[in-house]
Amino acid sequence: RLSLVGSEMCIRDRYNRKGFGVLPRAVVWGLLGMGINMAMIVFSKGVPQFMEYMGMENASSIINGEFCLDKLWVALAISVTMNTIFAPVFMTFHKITDTHILDCGGSLRSLVTPIPMTRIITHLNWDAQWNFVFKKTIPFFWYPAHTITFLLPGEVRVLFAAILGVVLGVLLAIAARKK
C-alpha cells in the first residue's frame, strides 16, 4: 500500500538502491489502489445492508448521514469487517508482489514475468506477517484509522485511506530506525 511510499520518504537510500524497482512498484501500487477502492465500496455498502438484515434499522442511511453514535458503530463495523476479511489477503498479496519485483531486480520485466506464488509464499516471513502485520497493524492502526475513514463523506474516503497508508509507512520507518 501507500505505507511503503511513506516509509520510502523516510528511508531515501533504499529506493535509490539498484533493484528496488520504483516504476514497477508504482504500477503495482496503482492496481492495489483500485483493489482498495473496490473493497471500500463493497464493504461500505455491504456491511450496513447486513446490519439491517440483522436488525439495525437504517444502517445504510446512517453511515451517509450526520455524525451520531449509530454512525460511529456502523463505521466501526465496516472497518473491522473489511480489515478482518480483506486486509490479510491484500497485505500478503502486496508482500508477494514486492518480493517478486525485488526478485526481478526491480526491472519492468517484473510486470510481465509470472509470479512464482508457491516459492514466494513458502519463503515469506510468516512470523513477522502474523505477529506484526496482522496482529498489530490491523487491530491497533487499521481498525481505528478506517473507522475514521468511514465517518467521512464517501468521495474523500479513498484519498484519506491513502494518506493513512503514508502515515503508517512513516511511523514504521521511524520505528525501524530506532531498532
What are the language-model segments listed below?
Residues 1-6, 11:
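Single conserved hydrophobic/aromatic residue that forms the stacking wall/gate
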Residues 7-8, 165-176:
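Alpha-helical transmembrane segments and their membrane-interface exit regions
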Residues 33-54, 75-108:
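Transmembrane alpha-helix/helix-exit interface in multi-pass inner-membrane proteins
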Residues 105-136:
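Membrane-helix boundary/juxtamembrane motif in polytopic membrane proteins
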